[in-house]
């Protein structure tokens, strides 16, 4: 039995906390919202994010950062990308011993263009860092928490961290493969959110299966181009952390990125869509980061460029689709 602290009480962190508890581990969740903490401790639910799920009664929650830090030597970092550096820094300020960090965030930091593992590495002093890994792949929290068969990938620069992650999470409904390409797995999880928003737009406009298939295929191509430029193995993008995550995020209404895109395709403004969703949509921030990163690295990413124009320059979605279709003739 292993003690694990889960930082973050969103949908995926909650679903994975439930997996860990059902696997026999001691789980403490940390969150800032005292009402959510009290609800989990009293009712064993987290209705804001997983409305109908009844959680393992052995999961406990706290808003006390010191208690959360002292509880375990393994931390599951289930926070939005934009909050990761701040919380990791707060953790570091209170550490007195080495900890292992496993994150499930799917984004790239605005401004620095850093992957999440790099953000954590920046924030945690080397003397307290026992290793950093990621768990990623096609895994909607709504399905994981009700034990629908799900398969994901664990990756780290340290193979022992990948193996630890596999051992902690794997059971009869959650299968975990290890993968040595940390860069590729992290980029696959982050970049697919851009394509998922675009896929939602295509669906919201009412375009057919031909357009959806083309978008995912060409989206995977530009993900691979940037990934290879940044040091990833292109083959990673044909695995769970790449095309697997891309497919599930581009076709499902469980996906908040797809849902945002769908609302935009239906004619809603971004502010209106986000106010209705009341959730963090990583694809917005990732699009901003990757748009500038691709320009810096001189990588052609036409779908990302088009989505950036929709999200940040108020260009109409139909105009951007027209521009994509009328690009210069090229070989595939």
Swiss-Prot record:
What family does the database annotate?
A: Belongs to the NAD-dependent glycerol-3-phosphate dehydrogenase family.
Instruction: Enumerate the Gene Ontology biological process terms.
Output: carbohydrate metabolic process; glycerol-3-phosphate biosynthetic process; glycerol-3-phosphate catabolic process; glycerophospholipid metabolic process; phospholipid biosynthetic process
Residues where NADPH binds: 11-12, 32, 106, 141, 256, 280, 282
The pathway to which it is assigned is: Membrane lipid metabolism; glycerophospholipid metabolism
Organism name:
Staphylococcus aureus (strain JH9)
GO terms, molecular function: glycerol-3-phosphate dehydrogenase [NAD(P)+] activity; NAD binding
Q: Does the entry feature the keyword Nucleus, yes or no? A: no
The residues that the entry says bind sn-glycerol 3-phosphate are 106, 137, 139, 192, 245, 255-257
Keywords, sorted A to Z: Cytoplasm, Lipid biosynthesis, Lipid metabolism, NAD, NADP, Nucleotide-binding, Oxidoreductase, Phospholipid biosynthesis, Phospholipid metabolism
- Give the gene symbol: gpsA
What are its GO cellular component terms? cytosol
Q: Give the transmembrane ranges.
A: none
PANTHER family for the chain: GLYCEROL-3-PHOSPHATE DEHYDROGENASE (PTHR11728), GLYCEROL-3-PHOSPHATE DEHYDROGENASE [NAD(+)] 2, CHLOROPLASTIC (PTHR11728:SF1)
Subcellular location, record wording: Cytoplasm
Catalytic machinery residues: 192 (proton acceptor)
Q: What is its EC number?
A: 1.1.1.94
Q: What is this protein identified as?
A: Glycerol-3-phosphate dehydrogenase [NAD(P)+]
Function recorded in the entry: Catalyzes the reduction of the glycolytic intermediate dihydroxyacetone phosphate (DHAP) to sn-glycerol 3-phosphate (G3P), the key precursor for phospholipid synthesis.
């Amino acid at each position: 039995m292993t003690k694990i602290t889960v930082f973050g009480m969103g949908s995926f962190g909650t679903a994975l906390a439930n997996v860990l508890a059902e696997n026999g581990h001691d789980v403490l969740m940390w969150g800032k919202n005292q009402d959510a903490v009290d609800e989990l401790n009293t009712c064993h639910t987290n209705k804001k994010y997983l409305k109908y799920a009844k959680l393992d009664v052995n999961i406990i929650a706290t808003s006390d950062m010191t208690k959360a830090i002292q509880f375990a030597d393994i931390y599951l970092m289930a926070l939005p990308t934009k909050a990761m550096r701040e919380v990791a820094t707060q953790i570091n300020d209170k550490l007195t011993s080495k900890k292992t960090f496993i994150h499930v965030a799917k984004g790239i930091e605005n401004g620095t263009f850093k992957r999440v593992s790099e953000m954590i590495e920046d924030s945690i002093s080397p003397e307290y860092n026992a290793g950093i890994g990621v768990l990623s792949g096609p895994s909607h929290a709504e399905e994981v928490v009700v034990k629908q068969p799900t398969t994901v990938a664990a990756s780290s620069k340290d193979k022992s961290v990948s193996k630890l992650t596999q051992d902690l999470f794997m059971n009869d409904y959650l299968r975990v493969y290890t993968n040595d390409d940390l860069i590729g797995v992290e980029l696959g999880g982050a970049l697919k959110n851009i394509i998922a928003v675009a896929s939602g737009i295509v669906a919201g406009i009412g375009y057919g299966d031909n357009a959806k298939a083309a978008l995912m295929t060409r989206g995977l191509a530009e993900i691979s181009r940037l990934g290879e430029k940044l040091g990833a193995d292109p083959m990673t993008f044909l695995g769970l952390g790449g095309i697997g995550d891309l497919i599930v995020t581009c076709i499902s209404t469980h996906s908040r990125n797809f849902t945002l895109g769908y609302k935009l395709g239906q004619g809603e403004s971004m502010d209106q869509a986000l106010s209705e969703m009341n959730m963090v949509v990583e694809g917005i921030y990732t699009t901003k980061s990757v748009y500038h990163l691709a320009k810096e690295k001189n990588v052609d990413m036409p779908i990302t460029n088009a989505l950036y124009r929709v999200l940040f320059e108020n260009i109409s979605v139909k105009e951007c689709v027209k521009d994509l279709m009328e690009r210069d003739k090229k070989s595939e």
